[in-house]
Regions:
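Bacterial N-terminal signal peptides that target proteins for export
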Residues: 2-15
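C-terminal motif of bacterial Sec signal peptides marking the signal peptidase cleavage site
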Residues: 22-25
């Protein structure tokens, strides 16, 4: 056999080997994508994802957060899809140092940096802070704050919100299956976040500090509580205790109405109504159910 013939034979065999390798790889990928492992939280199909935030409201005219960046962490390892707690050991401090690790890769979903008035996002009002597409299971959300955070008190005075250190300007939210609302038919996922403004802001020696408390919830796995407080213009403060040491706050609107979402299932909630100059009232043994709305009877405060 001539040298030319040998070279041609080698070339043909190399091309055939490459073709077989590519074909085999494609078959494995298609088989993995069609295995259905991602059907519970995030399928291999490209999904539209939205990050939506709301708040407890606060005893301020405004609570302005300087949101610089919003990101999601996608788990690129399909072998962990059935383990809802896989990323629980993912260290937030480690995430400060790199964009990818064994738990996934960070991806920006944020819009342009903007100031958001968290005091206005109460009683069911929400704000879209991020939207993008994702192909893999989302394990975490990261919100990076800037330095222009401040509050406006009820007298109209503006006060800067001081962050204790650089770590606190980055908010991490872990996600589990119950925290995600998913429309499989629409290839859509929604991540609802609740900012606990009341417990996140502290006043010490005339200085307001921000220690952000943000938790995820879903409409499908958490309950919603609504009610009405009279007189309408008393600026009622509502405390909701789940009986397990967790308290969520709400501030009634000018018409006396309030709405709180993201409440865990339970049958021992206590709801307390307070207003300056009025007698405090309580409702005991309030029941919350997954995916359902609980509407309280109207409460009339007396002086």
């Amino acid at each position: 056999m001539s040298m030319k013939t040998k070279n041609q034979t080698t070339l043909v065999l190399s091309i055939l080997a490459a073709f077989v390798l590519i074909f085999s790889s494609c078959k494995k990928t298609d088989s993995f994508r069609n295995s259905g492992k991602y059907s519970t939280v995030a399928s291999r199909a490209i999904k539209d994802v939205e990050v939506i935030i709301s708040s407890s409201g606060a005893n301020f005219q405004s609570v302005m957060l300087d949101v610089q960046k919003v990101e999601i962490k996608e788990d690129l390892n399909g072998s962990n899809d059935d383990n809802d707690n896989f990323a629980d050991a993912d260290d937030n401090m480690d995430d400060h140092l790199k964009t990818v690790d064994d738990y996934g890769q960070w991806k920006s979903v944020g819009q342009s940096p903007k100031l958001i008035d968290m005091a206005s996002l109460k009683n069911g009002i929400e704000s879209l802070i991020g939207d993008a597409t994702a192909m893999y299971q989302v394990r975490k959300i990261r919100i990076t704050l800037g330095t222009n955070n401040y509050v406006i008190d009820n007298a109209g005075e503006t006060h800067p919100l001081r962050l204790e250190n650089d770590v606190e300007k980055v908010i991490y939210i872990r996600l589990h299956q119950d925290d995600i609302d998913e429309e499989l038919a629409l290839n859509q996922q929604k991540f609802h976040l609740y900012f606990d403004a009341t417990n996140s802001i502290k006043l010490d020696n005339g200085i307001y500090t921000l220690d952000p408390i943000v938790r995820p919830f879903s409409i499908k796995a958490f309950g919603e509580l609504t009610g009405q407080v009279f007189p309408e213009d008393v600026n009622a403060f509502v405390k909701i205790d789940d009986g397990m040491g967790n308290t969520i706050f709400a501030y009634a609107d000018k018409d006396g109405g309030f709405k709180v979402r993201g409440l865990k299932e339970g049958n021992n909630y206590t709801v307390t109504f307070e207003a300056s100059g009025y007698v405090t009232q309580k409702l005991n043994s309030v029941i919350m159910e997954k995916g359902k709305k609980t509407e309280l009877n109207a409460v009339t405060l007396i002086q």
